[in-house]
Amino acid sequence: MAKSNKRRPAPEKPVKTRKCVFCSKKGQDIDYKDTALLRTYISERGKIRARRVTGNCVQHQRDIAVAVKNAREVALLPFGSSTR
């Protein structure tokens, strides 16, 4: 008796779309000196979170990435995690 190779299709999960925080709040700027804001977009391992995770639009995700990299250069943010 051979097993059937037919697989059931996975149930579809509803896709939850997020709104960009910076597009909804027009007055909020992305600055490399605002480390409290930038830390929310960095993982515990020190990596910049992806756009699909944060829900930002393309332009604001680029601005966050540039600001994080600038903050790392001037030693406001660490390059990696402090624990190994």
Swiss-Prot record:
One of its GO terms (molecular function) is small ribosomal subunit rRNA binding. Coiled coil: none annotated. GO terms for biological process: translation. PANTHER family: 30S RIBOSOMAL PROTEIN S18 (PTHR13479), SMALL RIBOSOMAL SUBUNIT PROTEIN BS18A (PTHR13479:SF62). Part of the 30S ribosomal subunit. Forms a tight heterodimer with protein bS6. Binds as a heterodimer with protein bS6 to the central domain of the 16S rRNA, where it helps stabilize the platform of the 30S subunit. Belongs to the bacterial ribosomal protein bS18 family. This is Small ribosomal subunit protein bS18. The lineage of its organism: Bacteria, Bacillati, Actinomycetota, Actinomycetes, Mycobacteriales.
